[in-house]
């Protein structure tokens, strides 16, 4: 049948990462292998007309395109403004669309904070291309992180550790994100989360080889911005 609704219960806590992917995976488990594109969309989005058709057109255009998405906009005093938390080459976690083979190559989505970064890093590791379309303006009704609870504040630093960023890249990424959110003190939470994860010896989300690729890619992107 065309549509199947699943009812899944969990705690009322708003914690980034695992809960949303557990819900996604529950739906994924209902699928057979007869699909070409798989999407992970949040429920608080309003898409422009022909969003899906435009996404499909990109996948048809180039077989090496593995991940496509538009941009999230939030309501600020009655005006829809770009939710500017990431680089323009990043597809936000709220609106991911994957080619099946790319989705298989990256091993699906990780049940962890940072899942919406590691997916793109692993896609590039497997030589897939990522496309973002500025013309696809998606209204995001609940700004990212607005309802996260206190337990979530160290999760970002934990994610940087589990992505094998290393301390220097973590410091740079933490400072950038804290400034983008206009919450400078978040920087300290991110760094504390990194060291808590290191002390706890939490498992990494990527292999040593993948981690080496990720660090090289991050340094390359930073150098490109400076030059």
Q: Would you name each region that the model predicts?
A:
Residues 102-105, 112-142:
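A short, conserved alpha-helix in the catalytic core of glycosyltransferases
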Residues 12, 46-82:
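Conserved donor NDP-sugar-binding/catalytic core segment of glycosyltransferases
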Residues 11-22, 112:
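A short, glycine-/small-residue-rich helix N-cap motif at loop->alpha-helix starts
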Residues 34-46:
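Short beta-strand-to-loop acidic/aromatic patch adjacent to the donor-nucleotide binding site
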Residues 21-37:
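Active-site nucleotide-sugar/metal-binding loop of Leloir-type enzymes
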Residues 1-13:
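Acidic donor-binding segment of Leloir-type glycosyltransferases
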Residues 152-227:
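Non-catalytic, C-terminal membrane-associated alpha-helical segments of glycosyltransferases
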Residues 92-107:
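Conserved nucleotide-sugar donor-binding
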């Amino acid at each position: 049948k065309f549509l199947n609704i699943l009812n899944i219960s969990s705690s009322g806590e708003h914690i980034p990462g695992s809960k949303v992917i557990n819900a996604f995976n529950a739906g994924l488990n209902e699928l057979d292998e007869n699909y070409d594109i798989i999407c992970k969309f949040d429920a608080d989005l309003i898409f422009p007309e022909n969003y899906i058709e435009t996404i499909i057109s990109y996948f048809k255009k180039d077989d090496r395109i593995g991940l496509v998405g538009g941009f999230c906009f939030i309501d600020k005093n009655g005006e829809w403004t770009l939710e500017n938390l990431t680089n323009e080459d990043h597809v936000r976690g709220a609106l991911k669309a994957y080619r099946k083979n790319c989705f298989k190559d990256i091993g699906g989505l990780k049940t962890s904070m940072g899942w919406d970064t590691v997916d793109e890093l692993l896609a590039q590791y497997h030589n897939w291309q990522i496309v973002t379309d500025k013309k696809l303006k998606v209204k995001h009704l609940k700004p990212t992180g607005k309802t996260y609870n206190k337990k979530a504040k160290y999760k970002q630093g934990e994610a940087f550790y589990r992505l094998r960023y290393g301390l220097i890249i973590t410091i740079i990424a933490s400072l950038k994100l804290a400034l983008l959110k206009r919450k400078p003190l978040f920087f300290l939470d991110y760094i504390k989360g990194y060291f808590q994860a290191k002390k706890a010896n939490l498992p990494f989300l990527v292999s040593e080889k993948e981690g080496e690729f990720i660090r090289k890619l991050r340094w390359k992107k930073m150098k490109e911005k400076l030059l």
